[in-house]
From Swiss-Prot:
It is found in: Cell inner membrane. InterPro entries: EF-4, EFG_III/V, EFG_V-like, EFTu-like_2, LepA_C_sf, LepA_CTD, LepA_IV, P-loop_NTPase. It comes from Pseudomonas savastanoi pv. phaseolicola (strain 1448A / Race 6). GTP binds at D14, H15, G16, K17, S18, T19, N131, K132, M133, D134. This is Elongation factor 4. The gene is lepA. Residues 2-184 form the tr-type G domain. It is a peripheral membrane protein. Disulfide bonds: none annotated.
Amino acid sequence: MSHIRNFSIIAHIDHGKSTLADRFIQMCGGLSEREMEAQVLDSMDLERERGITIKAHSVTLYYKAKDGITYQLNFIDTPGHVDFTYEVSRSLAACEGALLVVDAGQGVEAQSVANCYTAIEQGLEVMPVLNKMDLPQADPDRVKEEIEKIIGIDATDAVACSAKSGMGVDEVLERLVATIPAPTGNIEDPLQALIIDSWFDNYLGVVSLVRVRHGRVKKGDKILVKSTGKLHLVDSVGVFNPKHTATVDLKAGEVGFIIAGIKDIHGAPVGDTLTLSTTPDVDVLPGFKRIQPQVYAGLFPVSSDDFEDFREALQKLTLNDSSLQYLPESSDALGFGFRCGFLGMLHMEIIQERLEREYNLDLITTAPTVIFELLLKTGETIYVDNPSKLPDLSSIEDMREPIVRANILVPQEHLGNVITLCIEKRGVQHDMLFLGTQVQVSYDLPMNEVVLDFFDRLKSVSRGYASLDYHFDRYQSANLVKLDVLINAEKVDALALIVHRDNAHYKGRALTEKMKELIPRQMFDVAIQAAIGGQIVARTTVKALRKNVLAKCYGGDVSRKRKLLEKQKAGKKRMKQVGNVEIPQEAFLAVLRLE
């Protein structure tokens, strides 16, 4: 057991952790030359296209060190994007150490700082590695200083390497074997294993990735899932290297998969403890905190026949992604669907794309909202995540919106633009630290403003150099109103928004203008209005298409022309009373893209 090392890699987006993982796999002979491809571990098509890691993946490699001992390296790849921090905390719970990979040209970024603190809090040994040393703009001394100043770990002897060219990678492995502690645990004790991840396979049922703390598990054992109390027979155990490879057993300290023919999707929840049926009173391992969704949006199938398939697809996805939550809801405009909770906008986009790709569904998404806290005049407090569920304003004593504490790391030359952006988003500055060439500013921002387009705007005002990390802080009273959209004097519930009163007029005007471009012209005028309560704050009209009824009158009396025009007018009026307007999918998304 002293020859096992469990570790994961912490890095910001695009600092090269998936490429470094490829090098490890290549050096330890996990795959033949023919099977080797870039970013082996990013197995989802979506991950390859966007060039980001979404799910945590695990690999077991055997590395023969210079001292002649062969070490078993269990390596768990983690995502770097702020929306997927919970995936990172799960991976870290299964490790004894972490590699902090920093791009030697760009330096430390906010996301790696946040993940690094998580690792240190969980008592992991953090080992800094400078990547991309082959680039001309690499400046190792500045970056080492940044690591020490911002994160506060000693980086004087950080290993320098380049994952792309393969330079220094063996040095990284040698250092890893030396600095990261071996797992503790006892093979003779009763089985205790932590579920790091699970996913649903149509043939095998639930496949769980586990880290064994104590004891051992082999094929034919009866295992007990602590939270459900159900017993299952183990069909097979094994490791990924990176292909599925069955082994005789999994022993204390190892990371691998267990297949036990669990057909119920919620049969092996992530973060749960497994043990043998003979020792049911083993302590539950400390899991990791369930992260609450920050953003809610309605998802509706375009055709109502897909509703059942949609429900099934959501169930399978929740198994694999424990942070996704959903409840059924119905809308007058869109029919039946689900109200889903996500961690952020990227998470929402990715879930929607996975549903459309992997399960062939056509979906309509409504505008995302956050949870508001309302104090009613009766004295009770309620939480609302859907603008159409907002009670009557006369019954509300106080409305509070969620505030996030955002930490932004930005080079000094872009600081001014970032501050302007934060003020525009109603932010309040908390503090500012100058660290070498970078500045760390922290702001209290309304989550409503952060959720929609803050990340994209931040990247564009800082030319891509600023990085962001945020977490929920508190609820705070705010002057909020509900903005309704009326089309031909009928409210469309799926387009309602909750906005700050100061921005309401501007938002209403922008929204009606945008709708005007997207709603196709009909045979009658379509009035688009934005209203706060009973007061209309903005209006535009989509003009009717009309036939030239005077084409057949050459000259002739004016009363003849008037008769034809009056007749057309009466027809249009009648049409407007019975006609209904089809609202295209783009119109629902327009709410997101209000500049």
